[in-house]
Amino acid sequence: MMNDRRDFMIASLMAFAAPALRVEGRIEGQQPTANASRPVATKDAPKVNLDGWQMTATEITIPPGAPPGRKHRHPGFVIGYVLEGQYSFAVNDQAPQVINAGQMFFESFDAPGEVHSASGNASATQPVKFLAIVFTKKGDPVTIPG
């Protein structure tokens, strides 16, 4: 049993994100190569005891030119990874941040329940796809209208 929250978060992220990030197949005649890894992001874990918490992993795709999502918040915190495209989001009416494919983002780490005032696709021509892993207390909703 994992009691350390950091070990739990790392194991959780690996369990949900790793399958989404793998690339399958190879060119005919190509020899298999050793797996490569690279750090994507490092951030201190939130100071919470995760006993009685759950996580929900959701893959979200937003088409190009789609209107921004409605204001919302999460009662816990979010670890996100952009799989393709460019994701734009803002918290508490701050200037939007653009997160590119291959980058991670963190929401509500310092203050669970922050209002996400903007959330959408930063591109008018390409879709954005990202993985959001939301940690909440068991029984709490994943998302609450803003």
Q: Model-flagged regions — what are they?
A:
Residues M1-P19:
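N-terminal secretory signal peptides and thylakoid transit peptides that target proteins
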Residues A20-D44:
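C-terminal segment of N-terminal export signals and the immediately downstream linker at the start
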Residues N35-K71, I133:
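A short glycine-rich, His/Asp/Glu-containing loop-to-beta-strand
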Residues N49, R73, Y81, V98, ...:
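Extracellular/periplasmic catalytic domains that process cell-envelope and extracellular macromolecules
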Residues P64-A66, P75, S117:
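N-terminal post-signal-peptidase region of extra-cytosolic proteins
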Residues G76-Q94, Q103:
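Glycine- and acidic-residue-biased ligand/ion/polar-headgroup-sensing regions
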Residues Q94-A111:
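Short acidic-glycine-tyrosine-enriched beta hairpin
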Residues P96, A111-D140:
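Ligand-binding loop in jelly-roll beta-barrel domains
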